[in-house]
Amino acid sequence: FERLSILGADALVEALDRIEAGEAEFEPQDESRVTLAPKLRKSDGVLDFSENSAAVERHVRAMPTWPGARTTLPGGRDLVVLEARPVSPGSLGNEDVAASPGTLLDEAPFPVRTGDGAVRLGRVKPAGKAAMDGEAFLRGARGARGDTLGT
């Protein structure tokens, strides 16, 4: 991301300089090479904790607005995940490694078991509420070790 933002900024400055100098050559887009992305559905945002930690984290980053990376809490309430970070597999205990994907491994700082390790849910947005820190959410929701998300 950082590297691309620098390259993009440089390309933008170069393009603006060429336009200002009257040297820019405008070329219409070749419509035969157009590709279209399918419309996103709410179901496209559903997190699959059986995926590896990197895939879960990428899914969260890919869905920042609509449809949002989402899972369900015990009881069926929706939880939108706004930030997730992989947890080092070496930091998992034997009991954590044996847990099934989607299992809450501890009350804080909100680690959830994935297919190959765990992710820490940093910011979340419960249905009908404002976004908040994952740990603050767990304190209020009384989340407990062993609860399973996404069921």
Feature-to-residue mapping (PLM):
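Conserved anion/nucleotide-ligand pocket segment
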Residues: 1-25
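Glutamine-centric residue-chemistry signal
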Residues: 25-30, 125
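A generic "alpha-helical surface" signal
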Residues: 2-6, 10, 38, 54, ...
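Generic alpha-helical structural context detector
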Residues: 2, 14-17, 38, 58-61, ...
